Amino acid sequence: LLQIAEQSENHQFPKGTLRDFPDYAMRGFMIDCGRKFIPLSFLQDYVKIMAYYKMNTLQIHLNDNGFKQFFGHDWSKTYAAFRLESDTYPGLAAEDGYYTKREFIDLQKLAENLYVEIIPEIDAPAHTLAFTHYKPEIGSKEYGMDHLDLFNPETYKFMDGLFKEYLEGDEPVFRGKKVHIGTDEYSNKKKDVVEKFRAFTDHYIRYVESFGKQACVWGALTHAKGDTPVKSENVIMSAWYNGYANPKDMIEQGYKLISIPDGLVYIVPAAGYYYDYLNTKYLYENWTPVQIGKAVFPEKDPSILGGMFAVWNDHVGNGISTKDIHHRVYPALQTLAVKMWTGKDVSVPYADFDKQRNAISEAPGVNQLGRIGTTPGLVYEQASVAPNSETPHREI
């Protein structure tokens, strides 16, 4: 209703009856806080933005690491971070930025009040250099220290302790109904490793379930095809790349899918691969959550719970700021919010939609774009500025 008022003269509401409901239950966004610390205030604003655009799922990727080749091919020097305060493992949280338990709980409470569910993600057994920096003996000597050693019982003890810290108690740190356990991009070079990976995945699905949570995983079980059973009932799988998890096979095995196809909805700022800015026109005119790569399902297929898009901060320290991230994410969020709500039945031409979305604010009380009104105007001017001099104008 506020968006209607924003687009009308004198903020008036037209007279009539509205009847509106979504085609897809889960409509979300994933943000990589592991490779780049995202300030709490930014996440708070994004909860408000998502609520304003009727998106209801924010996945927070809490750990990750850079690429070894950019750090002298030395794992010990490669950037890695885990972003949540830990009492079980003092010093595990990244020195350059982390969230206290109380901050993370309060963020989730804010989200709950706005009907946004936060899904925390601890990614393992790959992307785990932050954990092996802390406890080197659980790192894989064969596949790299960003992989956990799945043959070492200490690996399970460490990860059990980490998940337990945030899942147990009367007021757990992870408040929501769902917890994401990662499970993407682990090596499949040897059959015994694949079977260990499948066992690890099954263990942590059941482990988070033992605390009353619904487990979410990244799709990997086509890449890691094997004999060890992995629980599928009531498990949500992020379908990101069909070579890692064939969506038709995963549905047949019993998984419910979130559509997050990397070739269409991954933003990797200033990387030179994937999208820097999503092709919002193409997505608006062509995509719905039932299109996962080249696999296309009937609209509103009950096995596909909804869709998400993601920003991955792959290149550590590349100068990209949170303002830069917002500049990329915000138009994508506006566009995909419509597609995840309406599916194929959008009726407004893209040019009109694009004009309308630019006329709407980010959310009440949010101004990450630094807008000054809706009509461009002169703020101040100065004919020239001498080198090393200061202007009397404050930065805006």
Residue ranges and their predicted role:
Residues 76, 134-138, 196-199, 273-276, ...:
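Short secondary-structure boundary/capping segments
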Residues 47, 108, 205, 334-337:
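Non-transmembrane alpha-helical segments in soluble domains
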Residues 1-147, 154, 160-178, 308, ...:
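Feature activates predominantly on carbohydrate-active enzymes
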Residues 227-235, 242-393:
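Flexible, acidic glycine-rich loops studded with aromatic residues
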Residues 37-39, 65-69, 125-131, 186-190, ...:
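Flexible loop/turn segments at secondary-structure boundaries
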Residues 131-236, 240-256:
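Active-site neighborhood of glycoside hydrolase catalytic domains
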